[in-house]
A protein has these predicted regions:
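Active-site-adjacent loop/helix surface patches within enzyme catalytic domains
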Residues: 1-137, 141
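Generic detector of bulky aromatic hydrophobic side chains
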Residues: 54, 60-61, 71, 147, ...
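Basic/polar, cationic surfaces and motifs that engage anionic cell-wall
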Residues: 109-212, 219-233, 239-247
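C-terminal extensions
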Residues: 251-253
């Protein structure tokens, strides 16, 4: 039996942590259903943030806001599925997933997005800041929604997640209003060509099709709007959406 010496020498660089993305989700079911699907089903996530007003949460004997750890961060959770971001695919291997209990619905493509509880957002801020402190590769652009990395397939965490508020708390990306205004003025005269816009989406991190079908392009625009222009996520590339995209690339890309 040979002894492994863990102490005499340690590599300082080059090496990096496996985890570089933080992916936010909603569960689309109540607490009881969320726990069942995430602990006994095919899906899993590292953390679950319940809704303390959920009757099934209280029925389970809990009260007040909690955060549940379901999978150790060093282990892979099955939350991202078929996914792409920043030139990488299959993000289960390189991400931490946070599921938030929120009973959003999709009935034949018609969505309802309930508000998140204030305590859930406070819990998310606490948890996300703690995670970000430990993973330096989680840059603002690498804090994403499931809809960002699974364009056309997923809509979570939906337009009710306060991404701007999170960014102001140091979690994720947001654009500068002044830079957005600059591009609003520029694009009010002439919008970029569609191929240029697709390139801009790719530059920011989105997985794109080249050439992009009309269906995919609309889904791509909608995914972006769900995150950065939640007041209107109709999938139509208008001047404001384009200005926000270019403002983000100027700030982060």
């Amino acid at each position: 039996m040979f002894t492994i010496d863990y102490n005499s020498y340690r590599t300082l660089e080059p090496y990096g942590k496996r985890v570089r993305f933080l992916v936010l989700h909603y569960t689309a079911v109540d607490f009881a259903g969320s726990v069942k699907s995430l602990t006994t089903g095919a899906a899993s996530a590292h953390y679950l943030i319940p809704d303390p007003t959920d009757p099934s949460y209280r029925a389970a004997g809990f009260k007040g806001q909690k955060i549940f750890s379901l999978v150790a961060e060093e282990d892979r959770a099955w939350h991202a599925g078929v996914s792409q971001w920043a030139g990488r695919s299959g993000l289960n291997d390189t991400s931490i997933g946070i599921e938030i209990v929120n009973q959003a619905t999709d009935v034949g493509g018609v969505f309802t997005f309930p508000d998140y509880q204030t305590s859930q957002i406070r819990a998310l801020k606490q948890l996300a800041r703690n995670i970000l402190q430990r993973y330096p590769d989680m840059t603002p652009k690498n804090v994403v929604g499931h809809s960002d990395i699974a364009v056309g397939r997923k809509s979570d965490p939906g337009p009710k997640l306060p991404w701007k508020e999170l960014a102001e708390a140091g979690i994720g990306a947001w654009y500068d209003e002044a830079v957005k205004g600059k591009y609003l003025q520029q694009f009010s005269d002439e919008m970029p060509e569609r191929a240029q816009v697709i390139q801009a989406f790719s530059r920011y991190g989105y997985g794109v099709e080249t050439p992009a079908s009309d269906v995919f392009f609309r889904a791509l625009v909608r995914a972006f709007q769900l995150h950065f222009r939640p007041e209107n996520y109709d999938g139509v590339l208008d001047v404001e959406t384009c200005a926000i995209l270019y403002a983000l690339n100027e700030k982060y890309a």
